[in-house]
Amino acid sequence: MGCGGSRADAIEPRYYESWTRETESTWLTYTDSDALPSAAATDSGPEAGGLHAGVLEDGPSSNGVLRPAAPGGIANPEKKMNCGTQCPNSQSLSSGPLTQKQNGLWTTEAKRDAKRMSAREVAISVTENIRQMDRSKRVTKNCIN
């Protein structure tokens, strides 16, 4: 890398906070795939020994209601990434990780579409400005007409 970083720095970001028991317990608390506390009584979740078919961490349950991984739908502020200049887009964690992944994919597709549109616009503007020149470097006529 040109700025003095190594390849390992590009692959694995640095974490500036130290990993403590408090951090570990917070991480474990907010990354469990538990159901919401209000739905735990009616739902046979992991606490009751049952599993939800087709639901990994976040996503719609069998009745179609989204179940966030964090209790009460609160995002963990410690999960936010601080990646400096390596990340062009800041990703918020206002909803669960599944939504974030979908937004990441959508952002990538939107970027691709934007690049395609830009290429088309450039091609159109270039073809409109092509003019035929004779040997004396004078513009004779517009090729589009």
From Swiss-Prot:
Lipidated sites in chain (N-myristoyl glycine): G2
A Pfam cross-reference name: BAALC_N
S-S bridge residues: none
Expressed in which tissues: Predominantly expressed in the brain (at protein level). Within the brain, found in most of forebrain structures, including the cerebral cortex, hippocampal formation, olfactory bulb, anterior olfactory nuclei, piriform cortex, tenia tecta and amygdaloid nuclei. Not detected in glial cells.
Result of changing G2A: Abolishes myristoylation
Gene Ontology annotations for the cellular component aspect, listed alphabetically: cytoplasm; membrane raft; neuron projection; postsynaptic density; sarcoplasm
Signal peptide extent: none
Region Disordered, residue ranges: 36-113
Residues linked to a lipid group, S-palmitoyl cysteine type: C3
Superkingdom per UniProt: Eukaryota
Region annotated Interaction with CAMK2A, chain positions: 3-35
UniProt subcellular location: Cytoplasm; Synapse, Synaptosome; Membrane raft; Postsynaptic density
GTP-binding found in the keyword field: no
Keywords: Cytoplasm, Lipoprotein, Membrane, Myristate, Palmitate, Synapse, Synaptosome
Ranges of Polar residues composition bias in the record: 83-106
Modifications after synthesis and translation: Palmitoylation and myristoylation target the protein to the lipid rafts.
Subunit structure comment from the entry: Interacts with CAMK2A.
Listed PANTHER family: BRAIN AND ACUTE LEUKEMIA CYTOPLASMIC PROTEIN (PTHR14731:SF0)
Function, in words: May play a synaptic role at the postsynaptic lipid rafts possibly through interaction with CAMK2A.
Name of the protein in its database record: Brain and acute leukemia cytoplasmic protein
Species annotation: Rattus norvegicus (Rat)
Lineage of the species this protein comes from: Eukaryota, Metazoa, Chordata, Craniata, Vertebrata
Gene that produces this protein: Baalc
